[in-house]
C-alpha cells in the first residue's frame, strides 16, 4: 500500500493474544471480553489529525493460527507500523515472537517501517509467565521498541501510543494529506467519538478481506 492511500498498520502474533481488542482500543472502542479468535484478515480505515491536517491509515487484524500464516505473508507487504503482539500470561506466545520477527524481516527487509514488541494483557499480572526483564531483553536483542500494555485497562494509552507512532511516520516521510476524513462505520456499525470532547465524529470502517492484496 502506498502512502497515497494511507499508512498501513498491522498486528501480528499468536491467536488469543488480544490483537483484536487492541485494535478496538486504538479506534476508541470498548473492550470486548467475549471477542472471538480472528479467522479472517480484517482491516479498519481511519484518520489521524496532525498539525491541522488529516492523514489516512489502515489497521490490519490478522489470524494468528499456524494455518493462516501463509496468507498473512500477503498482508505484511507494504506495512509501515508493525506490532508484534504476545500475551504476558502465555510464554508460548512470547517464544513465537522470533518466528514473527523473522517473517517480517523476510518480507520487508530493511525498509522504513517501525516494529514494536507489544506485551499485552498486563492486567493479568497474577498469571504472568513472561517477566518484564525478559521482554526488555528480547526487544534489545531484536533491536526494536517495546511496550507493555493492556487492552482492558490501558486502551486509551495504546490509542495515544499508536497516534504518536503515526505522527512520527508522517513527519519523517512527508506523508500525503487527505482532503477530508472519510465517512465510515465503527466496529459495531455505530458512531464513536474520536476524542473526549465529542467534537470529532468521524467513523471507522471494518472490512473482512481473507484474500485481498494491495
Task: Describe each PLM feature range.
Residues 63, 88, 122:
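Conserved Walker B
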Residues 33-34, 94-95, 128-129:
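Conserved catalytic-core motifs of eukaryotic protein kinase domains, centered on the activation segment
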Residues 67-71, 93, 134, 157:
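Short acidic active-site motifs
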Residues 1-20, 24-28, 47-54, 108-214:
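Conserved P-loop small GTPase signature centered on TRAFAC-class small GTPases
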Residues 55-70:
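Switch II (G3) loop of P-loop NTPases
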Residues 59, 85, 118:
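Generic enzyme active-site microenvironment
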Residues 69-91, 97, 103-107:
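Inter-motif core of Ras-like GTPase G domains
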Residues 28-36:
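Post-Walker A helix-loop "phosphate-sensing" segment adjacent to the P-loop in P-loop NTPases
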Amino acid at each position: 500500500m502506498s502512502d497515497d492511500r494511507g499508512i498501513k498498520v498491522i498486528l501480528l502474533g499468536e491467536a488469543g493474544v488480544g490483537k483484536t481488542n487492541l485494535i478496538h482500543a486504538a479506534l476508541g472502542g470498548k473492550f470486548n471480553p467475549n471477542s472471538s479468535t480472528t479467522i479472517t484478515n480484517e482491516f479498519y480505515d481511519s484518520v489521524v489529525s496532525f498539525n491541522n491536517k488529516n492523514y489516512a491509515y489502515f489497521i490490519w487484524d490478522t489470524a494468528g493460527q499456524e494455518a493462516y500464516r501463509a496468507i498473512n505473508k500477503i498482508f505484511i507487504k507494504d506495512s509501515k507500523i508493525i506490532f508484534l503482539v504476545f500475551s504476558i500470561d502465555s510464554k508460548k506466545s512470547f517464544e513465537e515472537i522470533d518466528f514473527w520477527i523473522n517473517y517480517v524481516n523476510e518480507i520487508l527487509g530493511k525498509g522504513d517501517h517501525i516494529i514494536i514488541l507489544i506485551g499485552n494483557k498486563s492486567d493479568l499480572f497474577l498469571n504472568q509467565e513472561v517477566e518484564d526483564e525478559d521482554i526488555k531483553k528480547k526487544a534489545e536483542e531484536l533491536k526494536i521498541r517495546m511496550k507493555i500494555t493492556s487492552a482492558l485497562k490501558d486502551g486509551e494509552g495504546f490509542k495515544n501510543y499508536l497516534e504518536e507512532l503515526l505522527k512520527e511516520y508522517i513527519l519523517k516521510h512527508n506523508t500525503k494529506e487527505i482532503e477530508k476524513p472519510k465517512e465510515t462505520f465503527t466496529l459495531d456499525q455505530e458512531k464513536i467519538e474520536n476524542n473526549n470532547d465529542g467534537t470529532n465524529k468521524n467513523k471507522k470502517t471494518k472490512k473482512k478481506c481473507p484474500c485481498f492484496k494491495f
